[in-house]
UniProtKB/Swiss-Prot annotation:
Residues 23-33, 74-87 have a biased composition (Basic and acidic residues). Complexin that regulates SNARE protein complex-mediated synaptic vesicle fusion. Required for the maintenance of synaptic ultrastructure in the adult retina. Positively regulates synaptic transmission through synaptic vesicle availability and exocytosis of neurotransmitters at photoreceptor ribbon synapses in the retina. Suppresses tonic photoreceptor activity and baseline 'noise' by suppression of Ca(2+) vesicle tonic release and the facilitation of evoked synchronous and asynchronous Ca(2+) vesicle release. Keywords: Cell membrane, Coiled coil, Exocytosis, Lipoprotein, Membrane, Methylation, Neurotransmitter transport, Prenylation, Sensory transduction, Synapse, Transport, Vision. Farnesylation mediates presynaptic targeting. The modification Cysteine methyl ester is found at C155. This is Complexin-3. GO terms for cellular component: cytosol; photoreceptor ribbon synapse; presynaptic active zone membrane; SNARE complex; synaptic vesicle membrane; terminal bouton. The gene is CPLX3. Residues 156-158 form a propeptide. It is a lipid-anchor.
Length: 158
């Protein structure tokens, strides 16, 4: 209750005394901003420095993430022989040049590469055909080889 009375009456008293004081000089803007925050000037300056450092840190992390994404895009452009993008190259250079992909992204790329290599093989193509059973095909091939060996043993020319 006392807090509400103080805020309601206190604000009005400050307005009243401020207008009666006449030519009071409020000083520079930093000092009034520091006082408004309830800090001394030194504390306020330290706070501002800390804010600037945090912003620089966030910007650096953001630039790094952008460069990682650009590296990933350029990797896929190289892989699929697509034209290069200048903005991706500039983002990589802004981050310091040699940007490594995060482990998770590198792992995903490896898995994609393995899947594509598997699909590119003859067995991968056969496995993708519908209605084809590789087990029965293997059994038939082994039976055929067995028959050929038996017929070769019976042959007198060989």
């Amino acid at each position: 209750m006392a807090f509400m009375v103080k805020t309601m009456v206190g604000g009005q008293l400050k307005n009243l005394t401020g207008s009666l004081g006449g030519g009071e000089d409020k000083g520079d803007g930093d000092k009034s901003a520091a006082e408004a925050q309830g800090m001394s000037r030194e504390e306020y300056e330290e706070y501002q420095k800390q804010l600037v450092e945090e912003k620089m840190e966030r910007d650096a992390q953001f630039t790094q993430r952008k460069a990682e994404r650009a590296t990933l895009r350029s990797h896929f452009r190289d892989k699929y022989r697509l034209p290069k993008n200048e903005t991706d190259e500039s983002q990589i250079q802004m981050a310091g040049g040699d940007v490594e992909l995060p482990r998770e992204l590198a792992k995903m790329i490896e898995e994609d590469t393995e899947e594509e290599e598997e699909k590119a093989s003859v067995l991968g193509q056969l496995a993708s055909l519908p209605g084809l059973n590789l087990g029965s095909l293997k059994d038939k091939a082994q039976a055929t080889l067995g028959d050929l060996k038996q017929s070769a043993e019976k042959c007198h020319v060989m």
